[in-house]
Design a protein with these regions (language model features):
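Post-transcriptional modification and biogenesis factors for structured RNAs
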Residues: 1-109
Length: 109
């Protein structure tokens, strides 16, 4: 199983992957985890990935272009069984979801 994770803060994931159940899976050769910096696909001199807020409220609005460009670049390298896009208003991840994902080969999160 290969898991490619796209994020603007890859350094935040170093700790959990070095000391968790994912580390044991990596050590046993059951999973590969690759973290990709979304800003590498951002626009302009500052590799911007966020957009202007609209409608008020707190939070960050992401541009779709950098994410699409990153996913397309990854898909050129290999075929993925799933592309998972997490949102704050999505469904809650549970054990049933984990069991279903464990049957897949490669995925992008």
């Amino acid at each position: 199983m290969r898991i490619d994770i796209i994020t603007v803060l890859p350094e935040l994931l170093e700790g959990p992957f070095a000391h968790s159940i994912l580390k044991r899976a990596k050590d046993k050769g059951l999973a590969e985890v690759h973290v990709h910096q979304l800003r590498e696909f951002g626009a302009g001199k500052h590799q911007q990935v966020d957009d202007y807020q609209y409608g008020g409220g707190a939070g960050m609005v992401m541009q779709c272009e950098p994410l699409v460009n990153c996913i397309e670049a990854l898909q050129k390298e290999r075929n993925y069984d799933a592309v998972l896009y997490m949102t704050p208003d999505g469904t809650r991840f549970n054990q049933q979801d984990a069991n279903a994902l464990s049957l897949l080969g490669d995925m992008i999160i």
